[in-house]
Amino acid sequence: LVLLVQRLFGDLLCNTQCAQNFQTLINTQESFMGREVQRALLWVILFGSLFMLWDNYQVWKGGESFFGSVKQEAIEADRSAAAGVPTATVAKTAPALDDATAVKEPIVVTTDRMKVTFDRMGARIVGSEMLLFPQQADWTEVGLAGMVLGREPSPNLGNVKLFDVEGGHAYLAQTGLVGGDYPTHNDEFKLVSQDLALGDKESMKVVFEADKGGLKVTKTFTFKRGYYGIDVDTAVTNTTDKAVTPQIYYQLTRDSSKPAGESSMYSTFTGPAFYTDEENFQKLSFSEIRDKDAKYVEDTNNGWLAMVQHHFVSAWVPPQGEVRHNYTRALGHDLFAVGTLISLKEIAPGATQTNHAVLYSGPQEQARLEQLAPGLELVVDYGWLTFLAKPIYWLLDFLYGIVGNWGWAIVLLTCIVKAVLYPISAAGYRSMARMKEVTPRLKALQEKYKDDKQRLNQAMMELYKTEKINPVGGCLPIMLQIPVFLALYWVLQGSVELRGAEWILWVHDLAMPDPWFVLPALMAATMFLQILLNPKPTDPMQAKVMYIMPVVFSVMFFIFAAGLVLYWLTNNILSIAQQWWINKTIAEERAQRLAKR
């Protein structure tokens, strides 16, 4: 947030017309040094306030505070204590974990998209490895950054894992029955199918069975080629001589730790979410669950539940139209469960009833998520500019379908945005060009009224009116670009489709910073060219700031996604060409006027 605000104010300072004209609109009597001290204090207050807002925003999204966090030793101690929580078997109460991480006997299933690990205990899923998504190295370990910092890329990063119970991590999916002494995720199931590899087949079924409390439960997990969803069918057979009405639950449990590979430069949301027709998408933080302050729809007959992290999601999509009770639980300090509880219809003696749900565990590919369940695509986090980021992503995706390269799609997007804003931008650049023409007259006024600030301001405003110059017109092209810039920032950060997307030569991931800082350096060069085309400031301090800004902001852009820098670089190049053409046109018009005289 601080960097983006600096980018905004920095561009305004680099635009000398804005810098000059804002000063002419401010009537001040303080000395130059007094103004500079006040300005410095205001910047300190601004940055301090923005940093505090940023830190609180990170904590709100489930991240850690810059000022410290709970010690891991305490977390591990509380997690161990949570393992002894007794299992609840009453309606509207979530079943608890007896042991979150102990795997009785792993059973590994392999498809063309993922490797899924089951545990016989509860036929629960304790591992899901994304075969097409390798874990990314931290950007500080590669390219020029790695050379300067003396860091080597982390070896054997492997693939991205969602469900996982290794290395002190706990993240798993469970189902079971409550309402009696029935099979839950804490009871042993028997594997009755033999096929554990998809191979050349289009689909494959993995079947588990368990008998307890007079019920025979058969869980059938169906895997399909090219699909991250798992169809889960739970068949319940009543082997007693009395009718029963059990309840089935679908549950996700995990700790609050950040996923492996999370960038140290920004924090993204990690935590549970619910979706219902009544309240739409509702994100919950782990702290809200711990403090029993989570707000969500508990009783409904629709929707889904999920665990969300950067670029990936795991979600239970139960059958729509069936009444269910959503719940959350804090199992100790660092284990959390979210789930939904559905009452089955009465099962007569000897009868069987089957309940169907889908477990999705994979990337946040928006087209897939939209097809799977209403609102599931909302797990893609575009921040508070979602209303603008969504159409930008749609346009980017459309352009990618044409050119087949996300980098060139960003270049085309920039050209389209520039064309749409051309009328306003042209007016702004014409205003800057006229300002350049009257700069000598402005200097004369400043010399004439150097001891009378109020009269100087009046004279300058009269000059603007006579020459038909908008004092802040040159700011409009930049101001209009800022929302697009911010929205594209969220698109690049939140869209898994751009994860690992190559452009040309050294740019192998548009969602990560440029490893060799070539794009930020080129952006600085274009900013210098823009300065040369702008009117020169009359204030010496502004002149110094103006020439320093390109260097400062190019360094800041070292940590921004390469795709974002590519957008701004392309925008600068187009702006230079547009401003040069307008300056040339105005010079020719002025020459014609002088010739007529």
Give the residues covered by each predicted segment.
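Short hydrophobic transmembrane-like helices used for membrane targeting/insertion
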Residues: 2-5, 26
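Helix-loop-helix
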Residues: 9-76, 118, 232-235, 246-269, ...
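Short extracytoplasmic/periplasmic juxtamembrane "stem" segments immediately C-terminal to an N-terminal membrane anchor
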Residues: 68-91
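Aromatic/His-enriched, Gly/Pro-containing loop or helix-boundary segments
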Residues: 33-37, 99, 197, 211-212
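Intrinsic low-complexity, intrinsically disordered segments
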Residues: 88-117
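Secondary-structure junction/capping motif
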Residues: 92-93, 285, 383, 405
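Soluble non-transmembrane domains of integral membrane proteins
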Residues: 106-378
